[in-house]
Curated annotation (Swiss-Prot):
PANTHER family: 30S RIBOSOMAL PROTEIN S18 (PTHR13479), SMALL RIBOSOMAL SUBUNIT PROTEIN BS18M (PTHR13479:SF40). This is Small ribosomal subunit protein bS18c. InterPro entries: Ribosomal_bS18 (IPR001648), Ribosomal_bS18_CS (IPR018275), Ribosomal_bS18_sf (IPR036870). Keywords: Chloroplast, Plastid, Ribonucleoprotein, Ribosomal protein, RNA-binding, rRNA-binding. Belongs to the bacterial ribosomal protein bS18 family. It holds the Pfam family Ribosomal_S18. It is found in: Plastid, Chloroplast. Disulfide bonds: none annotated.
Length: 101
């Protein structure tokens, strides 16, 4: 190879493969809350397959398990963190009103 061509070659960096999110021993079940909660966003939405890095079959089973857990009220349909923020702000305003009087 010429010297001029050798300048443009980049060395290939090694990368570490990520472990699969679901091991072979894990059971995808609506009662397995520690497993299911990994695949839900902070807002309570089911994360996409691309984000989860799951196979199609695993994603389908996770989705069904999450929906069953929601129906049985093991999981909330929505995370209502915004309501808590609003309630805190209303308590602050009422506290300020009482101070001013």
């Amino acid at each position: 190879m010429d010297k001029s061509k050798r300048l443009f070659l980049k060395s290939k960096r090694s990368f570490r493969r990520r472990l699969p999110p679901i091991q072979s021993g894990d059971r995808i079940d609506y009662r397995n809350m520690s497993l299911i909660s990994r695949f839900i966003s902070e807002q309570g939405k089911i994360l996409s397959r691309r984000v989860n890095r799951l196979t199609l079959k695993q994603q389908r089973l996770i989705t069904i398990a999450i929906k069953q857990a929601r129906i049985l009220s093991l999981l909330p349909f929505l995370n209502n963190e915004k309501q808590f923020e609003r309630s805190e702000s209303t308590t602050r305003t009422t506290a300020l009103r009482t101070r001013n009087k």
